[in-house]
Swiss-Prot record:
Gene3D superfamilies the UniProt entry points to: Methylpurine-DNA glycosylase (MPG) (3.10.300.10)
Pfam families: Pur_DNA_glyco (PF02245)
One Gene Ontology term of the molecular function aspect: alkylbase DNA N-glycosylase activity
Family, similarity comment: Belongs to the DNA glycosylase MPG family.
Organism whose genome encodes this protein: Chlorobaculum tepidum (strain ATCC 49652 / DSM 12025 / NBRC 103806 / TLS)
Name the UniProt record assigns to this protein: Putative 3-methyladenine DNA glycosylase
UniProt enzyme class: hydrolase
E.C. no: 3.2.2.-
């Protein structure tokens, strides 16, 4: 399949959250292993006015990659237990990223099962922490370009608007009224968590992207 180029990522974050649905995420590891997942669920985060976004108070050493250029990975450690992956959007200098919330396993499923400790394909990538574990993504991929030979996206037809579901984002306690979670309606691979704030015992952690 043809790889997506730089122009694809230079669009408004909310639009990118929709356009990413159906696209194929590829991780080509140094070992030669290749894992692929079809994106079925995303969430948009914007630095301007979105208090659930890591960049809403400005640039820091931690979030600087969110300010561009677009088409790079923003990886962070969440709630002390999971690495989450975001794709940087917008024009350079404007903070924005799309959280990859869930995928459908496509290739390298045996390695995903080994990493995740389950043979249930629907559970391999049905959450943002699950998919990074399945794909083998971690802190080493912070700032990784999606135009290189390690991680990239492959083209796939856009999902028709009538098949795109929308809801509030999951696991956040601020800016909860924004309907910036996008997903392929009816997909058995989307996350099962209900929109809304995280459980009280997890409030010491960081918000999603």
């Amino acid at each position: 399949m043809k790889r997506l180029g730089a122009d694809f990522y230079q669009m408004p974050t909310i639009l990118l959250a929709e356009r990413l649905l159906g696209k194929i995420f590829v991780h080509h590891e140094v070992s030669g292993r290749v894992t692929k997942g079809r994106i079925v669920e995303t969430e948009a985060y914007l630095g301007d006015g979105d208090e659930a976004c890591h960049a809403w108070r400005g640039m820091t050493e931690r979030n600087h990659v969110m300010f561009g250029p677009p088409g790079h990975l923003y990886i962070y450690f969440s709630y002390g237990c999971h690495y989450l992956a975001n794709i940087v959007s917008e024009q350079k200098g404007i903070a924005g990223a799309v959280l990859l919330r869930a995928m459908e396993p496509i290739e390298g499923i045996e390695w995903m099962q080994e990493r995740r400790g389950t043979t249930d394909e629907r559970a391999l990538m049905s959450g943002p922490g699950k998919l990074t574990q399945a794909l083998g993504l971690g802190p080493a991929h912070y700032g990784e370009s999606l135009l290189g030979d390690i991680c990239w996206l492959e083209e796939a037809p856009d999902i028709p608007p009538e098949l795109i579901g929308t809801s509030p984002r999951i696991g956040i306690s601020r800016s909860t009224d924004l309907l910036w979670r996008k997903f392929i309606a009816g997909s058995p691979y989307i996350s099962k968590t209900q929109p809304g704030p995280p459980p009280k015992k997890r409030k010491k952690g960081l918000e999603s992207s």
